[in-house]
Amino acid sequence: MVSTATQIGHFSFDNCLMNAAGVYCMTKEELMEVEKSQAASFVTKTGTLEVRPGNPEPRYADTRLGSINSMGLPNNGFRYYLDFVSDLAKTGQHKPHFLSVVGLSPTETETILKVIMASDYEGLVELNLSCPNVPGKPQIAYDFETTDQLLENIFTYYTKPLGIKLPPYFDIVHFDQAAAIFNKYPLSFVNCVNSIGNGLVIEDEQVLIKPKNGFGGIGGDYIKPTALANVHAFYKRLKPSIHIIGTGGIKTGRDAFEHILCGASMVQIGTALHQEGPAIFERVTKELKTIMVEKGYQSLDDFRGNLRYKD
């Protein structure tokens, strides 16, 4: 029997597919739609210390090859999502979940994580170090010194399962430098990647979205090669205890297969989920299992990370 079951840290999942933070996760109702689908789990909208309305609309647009967005982290505040995942865990349901959070300063991040630490939530936390769409706020994980200092401080008080969502890196030296930092800490996972920041899509003679004069994060088909490269680069560099979640350009079973082949333990779907809805998880799961049957693979472990190079 072909299985797409997987594991992140000590958490087991009956499938390897889930939503990406930002899509189908703003409200409890949206999260429950993902919960009731064939997704293995869900990740919440990235929650900040206070409620945020986000950037002015229009701030999202579908394109021929994916999407562009400058949402600006709209969310209901991290406590809204923390309360929801905590309450859901008490119902006895079997799915572990991911709580996505970030502070707009190191102090805010510490405040958020200390509240989670003191709560009864025992699930996974995804710390978003890579949002490219908050005006005046750089992507934290591009500053290696700041990232190192932030993680060093976090792990002086935070002992629950924690992973980080990363921006895409483009230089081999940066893969080496980032991995050296991440390997110092007891991270449960890294998520590769968030959208490619500050792209520009034009229709006729006008930009598609309003914030930042049309500049926004690029998702979908555009970013799959970059996402695959980041997944594989970190798979080869990180210690085995740090699992990898692959995000970027997944809309078919073949796309998911390639992410896992590059080393991903789990796969998140963003743009295609926004376009197709939660039914996408059933379709992509079937397509992935069909590929596995054709290739004689019974489990993800049979091919994870086994990307072949040319001689």
From Swiss-Prot:
Its EC number is 1.3.98.1. The active site is at 131 (nucleophile). The keyword Cytoplasm applies. Substrate binds at residues 45, 69-73, 128, 194-195. It catalyses: (S)-dihydroorotate + fumarate = orotate + succinate. Belongs to the dihydroorotate dehydrogenase family. Type 1 subfamily. PANTHER family: DIHYDROOROTATE DEHYDROGENASE (FUMARATE) (PTHR48109:SF1), DIHYDROOROTATE DEHYDROGENASE (QUINONE), MITOCHONDRIAL-RELATED (PTHR48109). This is Putative dihydroorotate dehydrogenase A (fumarate).
